[in-house]
Every structure is written in structure tokens, then in C-alpha cells.
Amino acid sequence: MAKKKGDEKANPAPQSDNEEQNFEEEPDFDDPEDFVEIPEEELLADILEQKPKESDGYENVVVVDGCPQVGPERLEKLQSVINKIFSKFGKIVNEYYPTTENGLTTGYIFLEYSNPQNAAEAVKATNNCKLDKQHTFLVNLFTDFQKYSDIPKEWEPPAPQPFKVQSDLQWYLMDPDAYDQFLVGIGTGVALQVWQNALPEPLLLQERPNWTETYAVWSPLGTYLATFHWRGVALWAGPKFSQFQKFFHPEARFISFSPCENYMVTFSPSGDRGDDKKWIIGDIRTGQEKRSFPPPDEYVTWPIFRWSKDDRFFARIGADVLSVYETPGFGLLDKKSIKIPGIRDFSWSPSDNTLAYWVAEDKDVPARVTLLEIPNRTEVRSKNLFSVADCKIHWQKSGDYLCVKVDRYSKVKKDKIDIKYSGMYYNFEIFHMREKEIPVDSVEIKEPIQAFAWEPVGSKFSIIHGDPANISISFYQVNTGQAPTLLKKFERKPFNHLFWSPSGQFIVLANLGLTGGALEFLDTNDFTIMNVADHYQMSGIEWDPTGRYVVTGVSSLKCKMDCGYYIWSFQGKILRRVMKEGFAQFHWRPRPPTLLSEKQQKEIKKNLKKYYSQFESKDRMRSSKASKELVAKRTEQMKKFTEYRESKIQEWNEQKPRRLELRDYVDTDGLDTDAVNTVEEVIEFFVKEEQTVIE
């Protein structure tokens, strides 16, 4: 071992010549006299920032106020309830229930989670949640107390944030050829595909595996795509379908949008938030939760909240009340619900802030249908109905007409549990919304009603009626100043559903179900049957927004065989068949209403012949281009096949010595074509015997 200079001087020792050659003098590592030492904090600042820091653990602790004050005998039950609610957000490693001198809990508790993320999630999910009618949780992080106590007395304005450029949300409307888009869901994973219905072949725009856990839906105007996840709902938008917004609502399974896409409602049948946040209304632009509601005491139909046409109001039914809320405050209109004893159902007009509701019979008081204006709560029209078992409200898409289907009875038998009706017959009460004093016409049908549908643009409606063995389809015309007239009646038809084109005039008659599949494409101008077709076991039909195409599909959720979808023209010509294993859903992307006035639309239709030559020329160019592309594609495929075949033939020839060696040098390559050396052996065996008696 080498020694320092000082040691060598103090303890000189004889050294041999070899030692002098093997050991060199050790260099001097002492700092110079003018050396200034640089502190580690300055020299290694970037490295020290990454050094793990000791945590005091307060970030993991939450304070829950608003708990019940209980004695020792009920403390265990309280702990069980608290753990059931708060353990859903993470592992609770410690809990503390302070008590008073009398042994009662103080009403606030401390819970410690295993990490800060779980604590923050618990605060976000449970703050202001109701435990029961008397107790509401007020939940904060323990560190919040220090944060709020350190707020400076003098306010400092926040620094302006840089503007974040959003992608174009209406990009899909800018396509020069006005191609529509559609969504395809595959499997239970669920993989999603977004296609553009281009010519000659649809174009795949986006495909992602496991994009949603259950299913996906478009918003009403087509701006957003909503997907479902365990922790909530995500909205996607823009050309690349990037995430636009996400809403925390564990195990949400249902969603509905307001008509103008300002708000959305989610429902979780078995959510993680307890019983007070089953329904949550969120602001789509900001992602904020605007209001939440507990579940109702009895069964309700989805959607429970129904919106007015301009997003100003939304309403729901309660026990003998109709609760109307207004935005953006989300409070009750005039701070109180409307008392309507016996109310059963309601529906908003698609074009006005008017809602229709019906009230059931009560002893000698007849049933009643009422039209109510909001927000002034004025009854603009009502009609009494007698011997009513049920009613269904059907608005025409333009809001020009309202139809109330009334199920009436001749006899009724009331048991302790159930009510049985007999001698049923049916009325269709037609309200003329655009006429003075809103006159009402009535159409009576004695046979059972299978389906009803308004023409979206026009004044016709269609009805499927009769027993399953003798189905008839009737078309009526609504007239001003007189009762609706029967235009056409088709008898003995095997259909159970009606699907009008969004642009009116054309309708598809369909038989949905595992044993169905029949289709009929009908022009209601002269009731010409344009085509008769079938799609066996089809489970759904959907028109595209323009009324040019219609899709039929067999979902794997209903049937495991022959899953896929067909695309038809509005005349019933099959354009494309797509068989896809695991096919689950198909939805056309909606379009917003046109910006053109009715006058401008009529002018375009009037001068449509001027544009025919342009359209035909463009179609010919597209067809020619498509043909060239198809020929080039097939030529390339044939070239690849020829190259592959030649390579395999060469490989087969190179393996011939090995084949001869394995077959004792007997050439068997040409046995199939050698008729001289080939022996054909026929073997017959008894299968079964049948005896037929001939008279």
C-alpha cells in the first residue's frame, strides 16, 4: 500500500530497486490555497430535485364531517357503514373516531388511505353526498386546513393562461362530397370503427381496440362520440377523435344528451357513490358536474330527464308532481314543482317549449291530455278521455302535430293486486298544433296496435294493426279542417316495425326478430313497392341522416350466427354486405339541422336539374377512377400470387431429392397423372335399407 509523503519522511525504510520501479509517487489531491468550494445545492440542483422526499403522511388523510353522533353501542354499525362507502376508493390503513366526554362521537372522523390519489378521489366523489335525510358528508383533505389558513390577506390576480387551440369539432361536415360517417362496434371488448361512407368503397377513418367497455353513442348533433368505462364516461371529438372531456361516474351505463349538446345525463344502476348520485348532469364544455339526483322510489323509464328543444328546461315525473328545472342554475322553475295528481307520462314538443302530459282516471274523474306552455305554465289545450287503460304520446318531428294513442276498454275487473281490462279498442287523438285553438281529430281502430310512426317531414302517419296472423298496415293523411283520411291499406303483411326516411316520403316495412327478416321498400307518394327483400334474423334498422341509405343488421348481442350488416339504397337496392364476427352495433353519425331557410331549400329543389350535369360528370369521373384503381389493385394481387406460386414451385423442385430418399427412390410426383400405373379401388359398404309400399 502506498504511503503519504509525510509518512515516508517520518518512517524512512530501505527499498529495493524493484520496489522503486513498481510504485510511483502518489499525486497530491489537496485543494489549492485559493480554492472556493461550490455547494451541492448549486452544483447538483437538477439531480437533487429528483431525490425522494420524506412525506409527513397528511396527504393521505381525509376529514369526514357530518357523520351521525352515536354512542358506544352503535359505533360498530357506524364504522361498518363508513367503511362500506369509503373503502371503494382505496385501502383504509387507519381510522379515528373522536368522542366527547359522554362517549358520543363528535360527528367528524379521520380516515387514512394508503396513497394520496385514493384520498383525493374519495374527497371528489363523496363531498356533499347525503348519508340519509339528516346527514350530509362534508369531506376535505387534512392538508386543506393548512392550505386555507395560509391564504394571503392581499389578493393577487392569477397569471393569464395560454390559449389552448381546440380541434375543429365540425370537421366531418366539411367533406366536399357530403359523405356520411358511421360507427361499428365489434365484440364485447369493445373495439370501435368509424367509417366514411365513401364511393366506391367505405373508408376506415379510425379503429381502436377496447375503446369502450359496453357500447358507444353519438351525441344528437354528431359532434361527440361517448364511450363507457368503469370510472365514468369519455367524450371524443375532432378529426383524430381525441378525448374532449371525461366525466367521473363509476359504472355509468346509460347516457342522454340535451338537444343542443350543452349538457349530458348519466345513470349508474350500481354506482360507487352511494344512493345519492345515481343521476348526474354534467356540462359538456367544462366537464363540471352541475347537479346530481338520488334514485326514485319506484321504477321509471329511461330517460328520466327530458329536455326542451333549446336546453332551457328539463323535467321529470315524481309522485303526483311534474318537476321542471331551468338552466343554467339547475333549480326548480319558480322554486316549486307542478302538482298534477295522477300524472303518468309527458313529452316535450320538438319545436316549442310546450309539453304534453296525460293523467289517469280516478273514480268518476276522466283521464285527461293537457298541453302546457313553459315557463308561464299556461294550459293551451286539454281533452278529457273516458274508459282509458293507457296512453302513448307521439310528437311529429316538425312539431306540427301531436298524436296520443289511447287504449280503451269496455269492461274492467279490479283485483287486490292487478287490474284486468277486456273489450279493448284504440283511438288516435290528433292535435293540430299550428291551427287556431288546436283542434283535435280522432281515428278509431278496433284491432290491436303493433306500431305507430309519423312521417318526419309531412303530414302522413302509418299504423300496423291486427292479430299476428292477420296484420294490416294503414296510411293516413292529416288534413286541415277535416278528419284524417285513409290513403292506403295493405292486408296480410308479415311486418311488425315501421321506419320512415328522415326526409319523408319513403318508408321501410320490416319484420324484426329471430324468426323475421322480411323487408319492403315503399314510396308513399303513389304507394309503389320499390323492392321486396330480406335479411334473416335482423335485429335493427337505421336510416342515414340524409335519407339516401338504410342499414339492416344482425347483432351478436341478439344472435350468434351470420352477424353483420347490409347497406341498402332508399329504393331497396343492396349496395354492400358486410359479415363480421362479433358485430354488436351500427350507428350513423347524426348531422345538425341545415342552415338554409325553407325558401332557400325550395329554390334549390326547384333548380335541381341545373346541377344534374355536374353531378353526373363527377360520378363518371369517380366511376372511371374507381375502375382504374380496381384494375390496378387486381393486377397487383395477381402479380403477387404469381410470384408466390413460382417461389413455391421452385421450393418443391428443390426438395425432390429429399422426397426420393424418404420414398425409397420411388418417384411419386407424377402418380396422380399417370393413368397406366394408377389403380382405382372402389369400396362399397351398406348404409341403410328403406322399404316403400306401392299401392
From Swiss-Prot:
GO molecular function, one term: translation initiation factor activity
Acidic residues biased stretches: 17-43
Residue ranges of WD repeats: 164-205, 295-335, 338-373, 444-486
Key words of the record: Cytoplasm, Initiation factor, Protein biosynthesis, Repeat, RNA-binding, WD repeat
Residue ranges, annotated region (Disordered): 1-43
InterPro entries for this protein: EIF3B, eIF3B_RRM, Nucleotide-bd_a/b_plait_sf, RBD_domain_sf, RRM_dom, TIF_beta_prop-like, WD40/YVTN_repeat-like_dom_sf
Residue ranges with Basic and acidic residues bias: 1-10
Binding partners and assembly: Component of the eukaryotic translation initiation factor 3 (eIF-3) complex.
Role according to the record: RNA-binding component of the eukaryotic translation initiation factor 3 (eIF-3) complex, which is involved in protein synthesis of a specialized repertoire of mRNAs and, together with other initiation factors, stimulates binding of mRNA and methionyl-tRNAi to the 40S ribosome. The eIF-3 complex specifically targets and initiates translation of a subset of mRNAs involved in cell proliferation.
RRM domain boundaries: 60-144
Species whose genome carries this gene: Bombyx mori (Silk moth)
GO biological process, one term: regulation of translational initiation
Pfam families xrefs: eIF2A, RRM_1
Protein name: Eukaryotic translation initiation factor 3 subunit B
